[in-house]
Amino acid sequence: VSLWSLPFAGLLLSIALLPLLTPHFWEHHFCKVAAFWVLAFLVPCAVAAGFSIAAQAVLHIFLLEYVPFILLLFTLFVVAGGIKVSGNLVGTPGTNTAMLAFGTLSASFLGTPGASMVLIRPMIRANQDRNYNIHVFVFFIFLVANIGGSLTPLGDPPLFVGFLKGVDFLWTLGTMLAPMLFVSGILLALFYLIDRLAWNRESSGVKAKSAATRQIRVEGLHNVLYLFAVALTVLASGIWHRDATFPLGLGIELPLNGLVRDVILVALALLSWRTTKRAIRREMFWLTNSGAKSSLALKL
């Protein structure tokens, strides 16, 4: 293993372990920890290869990989956050399993952040009266926030970085479809068994609510069109290969297709923000107050 990979390994281990071992320290100093590992790579790189090479590497990664990566996440976050699913769903084993299955399948097209944002609110509401619900959100993280995004570059951020490097848009779909369905099927079956056992322990009052007629309401449906536009924009940027570039100095050139893609993504995010009712977005955790949060508190 190359010594150059050690700072990256250290960063991953810090993200995985420090929140568990020293949560207070991590909460207040995670930026400093990240900066430490960045410098642990950059300083030796500048000494060994020269300052210009190190600066070129940083600018290349930042402008051609990190910025497009963040812009895609930002757009999916804003657009998916404008879709609100509400109703009187009760978190029965069948309902929870169906919601997890839908979220898993949609995550590759909404993105794992987008699918999680769309489904977490109805999932919380459906299970807020249950006394045994921790496992629901553990499997939600496994399926919707992780495995579900394995089929397209839209689904999982690292796959999008691979797409920026030249990996075909549909390569992951052909390669990962069978493994994804196999693993998801096992987890969904396991979840249903666990949730059925937990449901049998619930009070009669909770079970009685499941007999009511289901009513589901979806607001902000126009954002689905924006999501399709996001998918088409990313796909087109991979198909449209143009030689035109913008020189940025230090040997870095910004491809025209990437620039057009990023501008369109930002425009779609702004359109979604302007055309979606603010009341829908106020219910998201990133715009809500502590009182609204407490109303959705889980019985853990």
Where are these regions (language model features)?
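Interfacial loop-to-helix junctions that mark the boundaries of transmembrane helices
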Residues: 1-4, 25-34, 54-68, 169-179, ...
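Hydrophobic core segments of alpha-helical transmembrane domains in multi-pass membrane transport
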Residues: 7-18, 37-48, 73-81, 181-193, ...
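C-terminal ends of transmembrane helices
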Residues: 13-26, 76-91, 124-127, 191-200, ...
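Juxtamembrane and boundary regions of transmembrane helices in multi-pass small-molecule transporters
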Residues: 132, 151, 171-212
